[in-house]
């Protein structure tokens, strides 16, 4: 397995589960959003404020292409990374893709106090999460080798599930 790539909505647990998977697999962990922040010296909300979502998505596309070209990485992506065709192609080519599925209710619970999510600065974050989920869910599924449920499951349980199911996948 070249890389293990985690996709899914905000609050699905991509970063938490990614760190645990990297430790288990003895691989390097990378978070595309954190890498963008390190490179720019600015946080994601600031980038959204200054460059808008299109500016951020340009940075994200370049970062995903770079990270997917590596070997031996567990990569956690931003929730909207799948919206661009080029990103989906890079993610699919970059390794095994695991879609961490979380219900909108679970997403609301996990993101309600997080001020670092510019797309949720709305009057109704739950409605925003629902709309994002409806637009993105088919795209996550399109590129996923595995779909793993994260609702009401401790991260370690999700990690064990992923590790077990990865072994059952045919080579590609």
UniProtKB/Swiss-Prot annotation:
Which Gene Ontology terms describe the biological processes this protein takes part in? amino acid biosynthetic process; aromatic amino acid family biosynthetic process; chorismate biosynthetic process
Which residues bind ATP per the record? 11-16, 117, 153
Iron as a keyword?
Answer: no
MF annotations from Gene Ontology: ATP binding; magnesium ion binding; shikimate kinase activity
Keyword DNA repair listed? The answer is no
Instruction: From the UniProt record, list the reaction(s) this protein catalyses.
Output: shikimate + ATP = 3-phosphoshikimate + ADP + H(+)
Broadest EC class assigned to this enzyme? transferase
**What keywords were assigned to this record?**
Amino-acid biosynthesis, Aromatic amino acid biosynthesis, ATP-binding, Cytoplasm, Kinase, Magnesium, Metal-binding, Nucleotide-binding, Transferase
Tell where it localizes.
Cytoplasm
Q: In which pathway does it act?
A: Metabolic intermediate biosynthesis; chorismate biosynthesis; chorismate from D-erythrose 4-phosphate and phosphoenolpyruvate: step 5/7
What is the protein's quaternary organization? Monomer.
| Function noted in UniProt | Catalyzes the specific phosphorylation of the 3-hydroxyl group of shikimic acid using ATP as a cosubstrate.
Q: Specify the protein name.
A: Shikimate kinase
Q: What species is this protein from? A: Pseudomonas entomophila (strain L48)
The gene that this protein is the product of is aroK
């Amino acid at each position: 397995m070249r890389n293990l790539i985690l996709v899914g909505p905000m609050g699905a647990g991509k970063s938490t589960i990614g760190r645990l998977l990297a430790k288990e697999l003895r691989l390097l962990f990378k978070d595309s959003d954190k890498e963008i922040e390190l490179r720019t010296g600015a946080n994601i909300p600031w980038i959204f404020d200054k460059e808008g979502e299109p500016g951020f998505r340009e940075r994200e596309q370049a970062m995903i292409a770079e990270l997917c070209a590596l070997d031996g990485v567990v990569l956690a992506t931003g929730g909207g990374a799948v919206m661009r065709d080029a990103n989906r192609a890079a993610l699919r080519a970059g390794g095994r893709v695991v879609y961490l599925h979380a219900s909108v209710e679970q997403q609301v619970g996990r993101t309600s106090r997080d001020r670092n999510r510019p797309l949720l600065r709305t009057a109704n974050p739950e409605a925003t999460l629902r709309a994002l989920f409806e637009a993105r869910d088919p795209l996550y599924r399109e590129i996923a080798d595995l779909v793993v449920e994260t609702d009401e499951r401790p991260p370690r349980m999700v990690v064990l599930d992923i590790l077990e199911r990865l072994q059952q996948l045919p080579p590609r």
